[in-house]
Regions:
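Catalytic cores of nucleotide-sugar-dependent glycosyltransferases that transfer UDP/GDP/TDP-activated
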Residues: 1-236
């Protein structure tokens, strides 16, 4: 089985919290299963770029269309991983390479990770890795299931998408203009992402993914209750 995992962080390359730990363990565990081919895609942050422990080679260059804007993306392959996991980084100085400090907390985080989500799909097509399963994580890669269904079905006709919620408190809220100005999705998907007259990319992922999972059975049960689901219990 071909598996592509897309995340905004993954140890040891970049880590902010528990998601980074999961993205260190999960790809390696899946790669140990005979017959699996596993790819992990991460942003090429400044802290990775300047770390000599993570040598890379450029394998492709692309122009990623994000609504009206077109942004360069380099596809870099980690050169020294030997556990069966292929690691690709999405390189873009504007969104990732030139930013110092914390991974999150930029005013344009919504745009940054919408770009990353779309670039993941373009990168997989460019390196000709057509996965059987795509696994996406939290709000940062929540646009992927919707993009996959709305704009990439011809490229990935048999790919199924699994969306995993690690922390439902952060849902990727944006104003209504974000749908047209940044995401650039077809009009018929507006209602899929609409919540209280705003855009909620996690809601969109829940509605368009083939399977929605959480980090544990306990958390999955908790999310059935309004107190824990932060407004998404009706969708779940």
């Amino acid at each position: 089985m071909r598996i592509a995992i897309c995340a905004s962080e993954g140890a040891p390359y970049c880590k902010s919290g528990g998601l980074g730990d999961v993205m260190e363990a999960l790809p390696a565990a899946l790669a140990r299963i005979p017959g699996n081919e596993v790819v992990l895609i991460l942003p090429y942050y400044n802290k990775i770029k300047h770390n000599e422990a993570f040598p890379v080679e450029k394998v492709a260059e692309m122009q990623v269309q994000l609504s009206w804007r077109q942004q360069y993306a380099g596809v870099l392959k980690l050169a020294n991983r030997n556990d069966g996991v292929t690691v690709y980084f999405i390189d873009n100085d504007y969104y990732f390479g030139s930013r110092t400090g914390a991974i999150y907390g930029n005013l344009d985080d919504g745009e940054r990770f919408a770009f990353f989500s779309k670039a993941c799909l373009d990168a997989l097509a460019t390196v000709n890795f057509i996965p059987d399963v795509m696994q996406c994580n939290d709000w940062q890669t929540a646009p992927i299931p919707t993009y996959l269904k709305a704009m990439y079905h011809g490229t990935f006709p048999h790919t199924r998408c699994m969306y995993t919620i690690h922390n439902i408190e952060y849902q990727g809220w944006a104003n209504a203009n974000f749908f047209d100005d940044v995401l650039g999705l077809p009009w018929e998907y507006r209602s899929v992402l609409d919540m209280n007259n705003s855009v909620n990319v996690m809601k969109g992922a829940i509605e368009t993914a083939d399977l929605v999972t959480t980090v544990s059975e306990t958390y999955a049960r908790e999310l059935m209750y309004p107190y824990y689901a932060h407004g998404l219990d009706g969708i779940l």
